[in-house]
Amino acid sequence: MRRKPLFAALALVGFLVCGLSLLAAETTPEGWKETERREYTRNDLYGYIDGGAEIFLEYGFQKLTLIRYGLGKEELDVELYRMDNPEGALGIYLAKAGRETPLTDFPTRNSGDRYQIMAVKGSTFALFNNPEGKEPLFPALISLATEALSSIPDEKGRDLFAELLPPGFLAGTARLFRGPLGLQPIITLGDGDILLQKGTILGVLADYAGPEKGEIQTLAVVSYPSAQEAKKAFDNLIANLDSYLKKEIQSEDSLTFKDFSGKFGTLSLSGSRLLLRFNISKI
């Protein structure tokens, strides 16, 4: 098991000791003009994102709208990634944001600083970029973000964490994954689509405090359309388990394995769900 360490003329409230505060604006900030607008589909996303398009595609990317704004020599960018559903948008947001640092008074869930704001609303993952991090431009960035987000439908997705994860997980650690790229920063179970998610079947994971002092375990749950598909994924994982993971105890519906560092993991089949727990100190 390989765990990897893991907006310009509006008068707005500026920086506070506890973080950035803002006042929502309704229109494009005075003086700023749209200088460029481009759209990218699934077929040409690689032309914009060099080396990182795959994970967007795995989470259900559909279309990117890129808008650049200028004021003299200054520039701000807006990137709107339309995903196939709210779960996909939340998934890529959580994957990119990591531990969130939200701005106060912002209209949607977000994480950011003066360089970049990440946000998610409905089926859209949004990036608002202040490339040089200039503090005087931050009010204009907020204004552009508020304007862009106001036009996005607020579709409500399923609360998968409440549905699938037991209570008690550590705040800020919950993630969604739809394939190996979303899971890879946490654990490598094997090559390719090892859990047979096909880019459509959702998994959730989060960290929990383990029974040992200072121990942090991770629980992942993948919910399949049927028990038969869950069993097929279970069998595929058993047959193609990463060579760094040593099988210890195996039955028809469970597996205990050990990684190169001596930590344990478990895999169990429960109806149409696979449950994986790893980074366990003792079994």
Question: Which residues does each PLM region occupy?
Answer:
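Soluble, non-membrane globular domain cores that form compact, hydrophobic packing
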Residues: 6-8, 12-283
